[in-house]
Amino acid sequence: VGPPGTGKTHIKIKELYKEYLHKYGSERGIVLTHTNVAAKELKDTITSIKEVKELKKEEEFFEDRICTIHSYTNNNSEIPRNLKVFDKSAYEELCKYYSLFGKANNVYVRKNPMEKHPFFKFKSNAYGRGLDFKKCWMKSENPSRAYDPYDLKMLLAMQEKYNKFKEKKYKDFEDMLEYFNNSKQDLVIDFLIVDEAQDCSVPQMLAIERMAKHAKVVVMVGDPNQTIFQFAGANPDFFEKLFAKVKGDDELKKGLRCSKAINTFAKKIIKPIWDFYRYERVWSPTDEEGSVQFLTNLKGSPALKNLINKMRNSNESFLFTYRSAKSREDWILPFLKREGFKFKHVANKNNHVGDEELNVYYTWPEFLKGVPKSLGEIKQYHERLHKKYKCNKNWPREGSIINKEYTFQDFVRKGYLSEELKKENSFYKLHKKYKKDSEQDDYQTVKIKYINRIIQKDNLNQKSIIEYGNFHDVKGLTRDNVIVDLSLTRDEDKFDQRRLGFVGLTRGRHDAWILKTQTGKELII
């Protein structure tokens, strides 16, 4: 057990694997975690061990030995091999099969239906907690809001249709666990290491219990103070009591991430939980002093200037984290757009607006002044221009124009662009989706104005990396600086609130900013 940033994954598990490798070999050593990203980190850590390198095992050797719990259960059960994993394309088929699924078919759902669709979230949470749909609905916090636009009657009907749709054709994560937990197949395991054990759901714990019966050594690695997936079946009380007994070398104490200021503040947040379960943790900070500053809002707080200056003038990373979507939509993203910062969600590789698109807006004035641009760059202008500025709405056919640099006047003479364009330096006003007199800006107009703001604020070459994500999204991450929003939209268990705040704050290495509530309800820290 160890608090955030004490090397549970990169140091302790590495040491344990090395020890058991000498004792048992690698053939029947299993290391499990919850996500593919975490599994890759573990794989990279373990395969960097000198003795493991000397084994010269193929990469595939570790695919079934260092992986997610779902992957292991899928590969070690009697689940029919002809079943395909239910994915995005299967979801599209399902929507045609039963139209009620399409009732929540927005852009976020279409991108990742298994995580974002209310039905699949509810189904996963019910299964993770070991409850049927009716009991899960009764025990959920404001389910009508959480699983909007569906009510229990709809979800039950959808469950029946979903099960019928995937019968003998598809399998999902719940099926993988169910087949494994009901299997009579013998397992041969020398040692089993479970990372982030505190996040295990009810069926995952049953799966680990089954594995443990066949293992010579079982090690659970984690931190009960970071148990924040109760809605999906995690049991903080069980792991608080389990890990409270851990002492000696199995208790990690040296902090490798958080500065003194963040470490001190984080311990104040979590101390009431330590007191309740009657244990104390030794958790040292790094040598850096760091700071924790408070923001009353994201408009005019005194400490906000410090944050903006650091975001604008450093090459460090900044993480905005929060409890609800209201925080994201109503003040965090509006602040980032207003200040003209480039940003992205923690799950995305690319910024909200990519550099290629930004370049179109930034280089347009110089193109008008006669600076030659490549054919590819001019095509980017042409694709986005409103049709009234195109003398020829179609882009030149391949081979009909030489691939070289051209000036604005060259394309006017060739009959593709209008001379009228010279009157407008701001490309965003020429965009095909720009609405000058609209009472309420649509998505594209807001985006165009945001791009213009980046250029106005001279943030095109921004060095800092700015990300956002809710407390559950950011768990497991490390960033240089963290901004923690305390706003709540509903009442929650006091210890749950402390764990959420603790997880959010301890993502930071150097400095933290605490944003006071903007809703009237505030996270207890």
Regions flagged by a language model, labelled:
Residues 1-525:
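The feature marks helicase ATPase cores and/or their adjacent C-terminal helical subdomains
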